[in-house]
Amino acid sequence: LRHKVYGYCVLGP
C-alpha cells in the first residue's frame, strides 16, 4: 500500500 500520510508513505514504499 502506498498511502501518503502526513507527507510520508506508510505500509510500504
Curated annotation (Swiss-Prot):
Record function comment: Antimicrobial peptide which displays antifungal and antibacterial activity. Has antibacterial activity against the Gram-negative bacterium E.coli ATCC 11775 (MIC=64 ug/ml), the Gram-positive bacterium S.aureus ATCC 25923 (MIC=64 ug/ml), and has antifungal activity against C.albicans ATCC 14053 (MIC=64 ug/ml). Has antifungal activity against C.albicans ATCC 90028 (MIC=5 uM), C.parapsilosis ATCC 22019 (MIC=5 uM), T.beigelii KCTC 7707 (MIC=2.5 uM), M.furfur KCTC 7744 (MIC=5 uM), A.flavus KCTC 6905 (MIC=10 uM) and A.fumigatus KCTC 6145 (MIC=5 uM).
Organism: Periplaneta americana (American cockroach)
A biological process term (GO) from this entry: apoptotic process
Name the record gives this protein: Periplanetasin-4
Keywords annotated in UniProt: Antibiotic, Antimicrobial, Apoptosis, Fungicide, Necrosis
Induction profile: Up-regulated by infection with E.coli.
